[in-house]
């Protein structure tokens, strides 16, 4: 029969303090710091509001990572924490062990108690110093009390906890700084989004992601706020289109009002657009407004004209580009010169190139091979889904011999793998895949390489060949 170990003294003390809220409050300044994380977590989950308020005032770490406890937010518990912060802000002399400088409400995948345990015990201090000093440009030289949040707007209305927090922060401007680095929009009406943005320090926002289908006219209402995010590094847009009802003159004005905001973004580095159609024939307007060198250009399933690609290749801001993703942009009828010129501009820096499902033909591939073979930093190359013959694929593999940093390569199944109706001939694909793999091994030793078919018309999955063939789901 096993004998159960008796509870540690710290555990017994914690249990007693949770049962007796008055005792917990009266002895707070004498508690060992080891008790604070577990006691706070229990008090928060049990909604012991007075205990929470007192614990915040005596918190012995510089950072309180409340976001990890806010999976199911409770307004009264949040109010108690903020009331504790209010007391700290008005105190001339803090309690002896109080060190709190950062209230972190971001939704992170951290266990609250693990943050303070073992080797990571000093982590909250180190992290808070880095965040306040390096990552929040809106605070100036003197660092006030910091409140970190991420905004994820996915409901039609703002939840009561976030509403209370933003209003609380706005009323205490000058005493503390509410910093939001990431803004995600999934479905909130534009008038509600604007209401939120009017309560946020826009200077702090570094990443914006709009994941809902907007008309161009809606994007234009959002644009002035984008221009005020002067430290914006990354913008991600999904499913933005211009209604066919918009007259051409109005469309041009709308595009100008959007693109002109980039003139104010001195630190902008990452442009990511997915299923965006309104810039077709107008990409040059955006490119002319860029103020800094881009590190990433992602334009997947977008409508682009050949002139758009030319203007991209001429843009001075792409010369330090590390990632270029044109997946799903139809290039079948384009001259190869714009893509060749584009690769020429980034040959010294490009690390990731995705030309998947671009409809590239043998002649276009042949034209870009000389410059592709000089992309010495290339580590990831995705080219599957293009209409390439066996001979052209073998030529492509020969041109990758000097690309020593390649670690992931995705290539299309040769055209000869399909019958005249476009159906995959499985045996032929496996045979040609083995030949291509042998050809490559004669040239160099690949790390990860896969030859992929077009998606199956029934299940949507690509069959593949790496070390051996792999079927789709059918």
From Swiss-Prot:
InterPro entries: LRR_dom_sf, PRAME, PRAME_domain. SUPFAM superfamilies: RNI-like. Keywords: Leucine-rich repeat, Repeat. LRR repeats lie at residues 97-122, 177-201, 202-228, 229-264, 265-290, 291-322, 323-341, 347-374, 375-399. One of its GO terms (molecular function) is ubiquitin-like ligase-substrate adaptor activity. One of its GO terms (cellular component) is Cul2-RING ubiquitin ligase complex. GO terms for biological process: negative regulation of apoptotic process; negative regulation of cell differentiation; negative regulation of DNA-templated transcription; positive regulation of cell population proliferation; proteasome-mediated ubiquitin-dependent protein catabolic process. Belongs to the PRAME family. This is PRAME family member 8. It comes from Homo sapiens. The gene is PRAMEF8.
């Amino acid at each position: 029969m096993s004998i159960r170990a008796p509870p540690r003294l710290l555990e017994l003390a914690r249990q007693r303090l949770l049962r007796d809220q008055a005792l917990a409050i009266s002895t707070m300044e004498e508690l060992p710091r080891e008790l604070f994380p577990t006691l706070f977590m229990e008090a928060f989950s049990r909604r012991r509001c007075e205990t929470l308020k007192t614990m915040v005032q005596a918190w012995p770490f510089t950072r309180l990572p409340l976001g990890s406890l806010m999976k199911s937010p409770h307004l009264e518990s949040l109010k108690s924490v903020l009331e504790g912060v209010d007391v700290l802000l008005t105190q001339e002399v803090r309690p002896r062990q109080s060190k709190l400088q950062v209230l972190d409400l971001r939704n992170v995948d951290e266990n609250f108690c693990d943050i303070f345990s073992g080797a990571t015990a000093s982590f909250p201090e180190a992290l808070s110093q880095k965040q306040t000093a390096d990552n929040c440009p809106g605070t100036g030289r003197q660092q006030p009390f910091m409140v970190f949040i991420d905004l994820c707007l996915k409901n039609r209305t703002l939840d009561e906890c976030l509403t209370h927090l933003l209003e609380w922060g706005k009323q205490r401007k000058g005493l503390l700084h509410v910093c939001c680095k990431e803004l995600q929009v999934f479905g909130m009406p534009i008038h509600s989004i604007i209401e939120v943005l009017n309560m946020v320090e826009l200077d702090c926002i570094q990443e914006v992601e709009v994941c809902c289908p907007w008309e161009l006219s809606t994007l234009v209402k959002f644009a002035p706020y984008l221009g005020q995010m002067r430290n914006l590094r990354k913008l991600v847009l999904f499913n933005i289109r211009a209604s066919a009802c918009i007259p051409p003159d109005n469309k041009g004005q709308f595009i100008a009002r959007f693109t002109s905001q980039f003139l104010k973004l001195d630190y902008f580095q990452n442009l990511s657009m997915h299923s965006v159609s309104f810039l077709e024939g107008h990409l040059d307007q955006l490119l002319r407004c860029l103020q800094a060198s881009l590190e990433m250009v992602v334009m997947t399933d977008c409508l682009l004209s050949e002139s758009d690609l030319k203007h991209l290749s001429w843009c001075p801001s792409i010369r330090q580009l590390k990632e270029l993703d044109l997946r799903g942009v139809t290039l079948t009828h384009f001259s190869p010169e714009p893509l060749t010129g584009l690769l020429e501009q980034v040959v010294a820096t490009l690390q990731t190139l995705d030309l998947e499902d671009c409809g590239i033909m043998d002649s276009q591939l042949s034209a870009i091979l000389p410059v592709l073979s000089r992309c010495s930093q290339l580590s990831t190359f995705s080219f599957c889904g293009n209409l390439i013959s066996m001979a052209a694929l073998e030529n492509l593999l020969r041109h990758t011999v000097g690309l020593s940093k390649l670690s992931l390569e995705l290539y299309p199944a040769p055209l000869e793998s399909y019958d005249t109706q476009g159906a995959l001939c499985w045996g032929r694909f496996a045979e040609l895949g083995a030949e291509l793999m042998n050809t490559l091994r004669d040239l160099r030793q690949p790390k990860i390489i896969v030859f992929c078919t077009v998606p199956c018309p029934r299940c949507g999955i690509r069959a593949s060949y790496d070390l051996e063939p792999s079927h789709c789901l059918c």
